[in-house]
């Protein structure tokens, strides 16, 4: 059951000029469900992305990297994205690569563009052949119903074990020009740092030079999708894509040092964080949304390292599910996080406003009923003070319930 999942009104998902979306029911894995998405981008847009660090990456990830490398080398820009659910096209070897390229070629033929201008994405079951003929057969319908307002349908078309579609949108003013941003994401399990069974697509109408967009997508991913964890597994297919359509009146952003870049980064990060947090709120079997903040570190990297040790711990996550204030498990996770010179005698631990541990030991004033009161909440904040610097980092995670096991045990049935 999703945790405090906000209601998404399709009418409040702003169309982004220069971007249209269409979907189809292609029976990739199950009948009568949206399972193919096509996103078309008008000429002149810039597109960039970051992808899984799993060495067993899926075939479409390999093809996306190839096509974006050609764009960065001066080739024609990306004009379309195609996404299928129900099959990951991962662990499929050379036939899988051939199918990913065949998908691009077929969409390119139908749309009148080059195969290298298409980025393919797949999500679903690993180690099964992609039903390429069914996927290709769905492309004409997806192209036919493209519209700028189809963001909510698009969010539905990329769902797998998600229980709800995930989308976010906002408009901001930069240097007196209105910029529209809208995005969708999917994911409910196998989520950890460097992304995982996670797809995110975020479009906006600012005009951004390719090298600047390449920097922006990495920066935004590091502040959003790389700050979430559900079960600590890294998947084969995760991808986060930014589309800058260039249709707004704001002059091109050509430098990462410009005030306009800083303003755009703030806006894109806000939408990306909303999309990332929706994934955690819809985590498989999740009943609680947990924010873990580590402060007072020597570097943001070590703060995030400790935060993830807490967020990945099955013992910590099951304690939250049970509302059991066995909070020594958090201290243990801090201790094995791998920060070699950590002085545990300086560490304070808070659960919301409750000081649980002070200077590395139990706070004499701490009462277990206070800890349990917080742990019964559906929204919980864990705060760790390291006392060794000024850096900090925040991640978002969820608890681990019986339903998580059931969902994953029954995934293919």
Curated annotation (Swiss-Prot):
CDD domains assigned: OAT (cd02152)
Leading EC class: transferase
Keywords annotated in UniProt: Acyltransferase, Amino-acid biosynthesis, Arginine biosynthesis, Autocatalytic cleavage, Cytoplasm, Multifunctional enzyme, Transferase
Alphabetized GO MF terms: glutamate N-acetyltransferase activity; L-glutamate N-acetyltransferase activity
Record: residues binding substrate: 160, 186, 197, 284, 408, 413
One GO BP annotation of this record: L-arginine biosynthetic process
E.C. code: 2.3.1.35, 2.3.1.1
Involved pathway(s): Amino-acid biosynthesis; L-arginine biosynthesis; L-ornithine and N-acetyl-L-glutamate from L-glutamate and N(2)-acetyl-L-ornithine (cyclic): step 1/1; Amino-acid biosynthesis; L-arginine biosynthesis; N(2)-acetyl-L-ornithine from L-glutamate: step 1/4
Residues of the active site: 197
Catalytic activity: N(2)-acetyl-L-ornithine + L-glutamate = N-acetyl-L-glutamate + L-ornithine; L-glutamate + acetyl-CoA = N-acetyl-L-glutamate + CoA + H(+)
Positions of the record's site feature: Involved in the stabilization of negative charge on the oxyanion by the formation of the oxyanion hole: 123-124
Compartment(s): Cytoplasm
Residues the record marks as site: Cleavage: 196-197
Cellular component annotations (GO), alphabetically ordered: cytoplasm
Pfam families in the cross-refs: ArgJ (PF01960)
Top-level taxonomic group: Bacteria
Assembly description: Heterotetramer of two alpha and two beta chains.
Record function comment: Catalyzes two activities which are involved in the cyclic version of arginine biosynthesis: the synthesis of N-acetylglutamate from glutamate and acetyl-CoA as the acetyl donor, and of ornithine by transacetylation between N(2)-acetylornithine and glutamate.
PANTHER family: ARGININE BIOSYNTHESIS BIFUNCTIONAL PROTEIN ARGJ, ARGININE BIOSYNTHESIS BIFUNCTIONAL PROTEIN ARGJ, MITOCHONDRIAL
Family: Belongs to the ArgJ family.
Official protein name in the record: Arginine biosynthesis bifunctional protein ArgJ
Gene (UniProt): argJ
């Amino acid at each position: 059951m999703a945790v405090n999942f906000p209601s998404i009104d399709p009418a409040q998902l702003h169309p982004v000029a220069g971007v249209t979306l269409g979907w189809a029911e292609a029976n990739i894995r199950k009948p009568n469900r949206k399972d193919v998405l096509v996103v078309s981008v008008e000429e002149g847009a810039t597109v960039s992305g970051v992808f899984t660090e799993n060495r067993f990456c899926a075939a479409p990830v390999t093809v996306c990297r190839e096509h974006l490398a050609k764009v960065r080398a001066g080739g024609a820009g990306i004009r379309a994205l195609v996404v299928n659910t129900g099959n990951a096209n991962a662990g499929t070897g050379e036939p899988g690569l051939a199918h990913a390229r065949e998908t691009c070629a077929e969409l390119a033929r139908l749309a009148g563009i080059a195969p290298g201008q298409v980025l393919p994405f797949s999500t679903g079951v690993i180690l099964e052949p992609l039903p390429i003929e069914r996927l290709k057969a769905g492309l004409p319908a997806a192209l036919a119903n493209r519209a700028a307002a189809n963001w909510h349908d698009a969010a539905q078309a990329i769902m797998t074990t998600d229980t709800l579609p995930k989308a976010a949108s906002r408009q901001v003013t930069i240097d007196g020009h209105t910029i529209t941003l809208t995005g969708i994401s999917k994911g409910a399990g196998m989520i950890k740092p460097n992304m995982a069974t996670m797809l995110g697509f975020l479009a906006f109408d600012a005009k951004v030079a390719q090298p600047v967009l390449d920097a922006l997508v990495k920066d935004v991913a590091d502040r959003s999708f790389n700050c979430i964890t559900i079960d600590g597994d890294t998947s084969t297919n995760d991808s986060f894509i930014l589309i800058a359509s260039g249709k707004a009146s704001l002059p091109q952003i050509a430098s990462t040092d410009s005030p306009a870049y800083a303003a755009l980064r703030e806006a894109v990060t806000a939408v990306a964080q909303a999309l990332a947090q929706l994934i955690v709120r819809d985590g498989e079997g999740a009943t609680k949304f947990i924010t873990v903040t580590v402060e007072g570190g020597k570097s943001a990297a070590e703060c995030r390292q400790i935060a993830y040790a807490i967020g990945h711990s099955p013992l910590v996550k099951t304690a939250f599910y049970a509302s059991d204030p066995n909070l020594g498990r958090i201290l243990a996770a801090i201790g094995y996080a791998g920060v070699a010179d950590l002085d545990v005698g300086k560490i304070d631990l808070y659960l919301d406003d409750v000081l649980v541990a002070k200077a590395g030991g139990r706070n004499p004033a701490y009462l277990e009923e206070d800890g349990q009161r917080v742990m019964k909440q559906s929204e919980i904040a864990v705060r760790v003070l390291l006392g060794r610097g000024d850096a900090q980092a925040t991640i978002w995670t969820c608890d681990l319930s019986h339903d998580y096991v059931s969902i994953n045990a029954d995934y293919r049935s």
